Amino acid sequence: MKNEPHHVSTENILPDKQGVASFGTTDSSERVTYFQAEDVLVSNIRPYFKKMWFATTSGGCNADVLCFRALDKKYAYLLKSIMFQDGFFDYVMSGAKGTKMPRGDKTHIMLYPIPLFSETQLLKFIEYNKISFGEGGRMRSLSRVSRKQRYSTLDFPAENRVPTGMQNSPESIKAFAVFDVTFNIYS
């Protein structure tokens, strides 16, 4: 695995949810979590920097980068949109351990309250993302608008949130973290 061309560490991910600057390298002695396109990678060191990347390719990341994946790819953008909210990073910081270089607590992160969506809302969200990002790529015409501006319009009211461990979710819309902890999205 020496010189993996798509290796991501906390140093490669840009602050304020701006993606990844470049890819690093690793050697065979480093433990690597493999990620796929449309996974959400989040730096777990100093979560207040809000380092997040919605992967556009596959590769590997080190243990300081958390990798989240929607089990059903059609919900990948929904997962990204939920995690893109500043409230997600505020929540991570509320359970972080350490003062000089705080780290998110994986168990705490997996209890992040996820909005409840009706089937109609889920279908509208999926259709919007087909138009915006995939089929036709209309979002490219909005390239002058920052990612932060585009996603700040997605509001997930607090009254529609439930802790992830409190309900069973349909198998089709579950997501999981690649570090072997379940992360559920409920409908």
Regions found by a protein language model. Give the residues of each.
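Short coil/turn segments at secondary-structure boundaries
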Residues: 1-7, 93-96
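Sequence-specific dsDNA recognition surfaces
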Residues: 3-37
